[in-house]
Amino acid sequence: MNSEPDATPSPTTRSQPPPAHPHLPHLPHLPHLLHEHPDPIMHQPPASALATPGLPAVSERLYNQDLAPTKVEGRRWSAYNIFALWANDVHSLGNYGFALGLFALGLGGWQILVSLGIGAALLFFLLSLSGFMGIKTGVPFPVMSRIAFGIHGAQIPALIRGAVAVVWFGIQTYLASLVLRVLLIALSPGLKDMDHNSILGLSTLGWLTFVFLWIVQVIIVRYGMDMIRKYEAYAGPIILVTLAALAVWMFTNAGSIAWATPDSLTGGAMWREIFVGGALWVSIYATFLLNFCDFTRNSKSRRSIVKGNFWGIPLNVLLFGLIAVVLAGAQFKISGVFIASPADIVQTIPNTFLLVIAALALLVLTIAVNLIANFVAPIYALTNLFPRKLNFFRAGLLSAVIGLVILPWNLYKSPVVINYFLGGLGGLLGPLFGVIITDYWLIRRTKINVPELYTDAPTATYFYRGGVNPRAIAAFVPAAIVALAIAFVPLFKPVSPFSWFFGAGIAALSYYVLADRHRDYHDVSGEPIAIPSVH
């Protein structure tokens, strides 16, 4: 893999005169327009780009201020911001449920830590590869997908990633509303009377709490990616302190912890489950492996990505695993039963004040996870689909509305939806990753003509055939079929936890064979058509 500097504006780009206002593009007809303003939509690059010779004509069907590359100068995501992103997402209630499930399946404390460590090591490497793509090009995931799949074919990976996210946005908001209901009833027991009826599957109190959290998230998104960055930065320490304190409280109550159960696995069965756990941990982050560039396009340097990933993935995951082991082991020591989530422990806190504090922290956590994992991806996917009509806020509002009207609480209660619809979509993520990562690192060797990602000229690099790269599709489809078969066909149940790896590996190998490896690729900076980053 070619080495590349932290940020890669071309020398000619650096010599361009800076705009009069550091956050204002050269737009004489829209002098008031800032990138962080959520309402106007800018369909053309800054006027200064017209003075740059050789730039292709930008299509308004492919470009607006949210899809445009970000300028190198002014990027705000530091190593701490990357770490805070992982501090929130790794410690999600769903992930704790997964880790606690490993305990219930027969793995002891040290085996769980080894399993998570294996998965974290793989993720650190893969997420660094994905993250470097973002800082090099400055583009979001739907635009990044144009490199391998074509300017129109990119809708396939963007919409698959967005569909998974928008459904989980609704489900995670519903799960957060359950925590809020517990909190409100603890403060005012009389509210329990509002929790017995059913309106479209949700009680009156359930509707009030869901809509409240829905509105809170929409308000945060109203102010763009920079507000999300700030929220994650503050939420991260709150989550770590709260969950660590919860683990200490449980350990104190139990006096010690059970590092294993009487029927813990040993020998080959134990090691199989260890590797299964590591593989599933990677699969959980299959979504982030695709669209991590949505965040790293605003990173200050490659060093900040590596540092943020190192503290946020291997070390933070081990801390997460230790907390999970203490919570599970202490609860098993106390009652002889397993817990499914830290929320189960919070409900047992005898002190109302401490219960309220813990419940609020879990709400902060769930919102933080939802914003980064399930809100950003569909926003960019929808913006890429309708760039002339949607920007970051409008797409965010549309995503939120979809997440509401699908009545996610009913979907969550349906095993068919969770296992087959979401599981099926998730099974497609590995093949997408295999094609995209192989094309960028092995075929093009990081040489990307960024301005041509925004032109629909038939002679452009990423137009392929009618805007779709048939070789990428030819590699993706068979790999996706194999991955889905491994995930769902009972015959392949012993290897089903590894379906992501099969899909990614087959797609990567197929694309490497099918792609044009002898073509000369050119590295052209997107700086002339970039807009200031306020993220």
Task: Annotate each predicted stretch with a short phrase.
Residues 118-126, 160-172, 237-252, 280-287, ...:
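Selective recognition of specific alpha-helical transmembrane segments in multi-pass small-molecule
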Residues 77-95, 209-216, 247-254, 263-327, ...:
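Hydrophobic, membrane-embedded alpha-helices of multi-pass small-molecule transporters
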Residues 173, 177-186, 237-263, 284-285, ...:
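Hydrophobic alpha-helical segments and their helix-loop junctions in multi-pass secondary transporters
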Residues 37-109, 243-244, 253-254, 265-278, ...:
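Membrane-interface "cap" regions at the ends of multi-pass membrane proteins
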Residues 158, 185-222, 237-246, 274-292, ...:
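Transmembrane alpha-helical segments of multi-pass small-molecule transport proteins
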Residues 59-149, 153-156, 166, 287-314, ...:
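Transmembrane helix-boundary motif of multi-pass solute transporters/channels
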Residues 160, 171, 177, 208-250, ...:
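Membrane-interface loop-to-helix entry segments
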Residues 69, 432-513, 517, 522-528:
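C-terminal membrane-solvent junction of multi-pass transporters and transport-like membrane proteins
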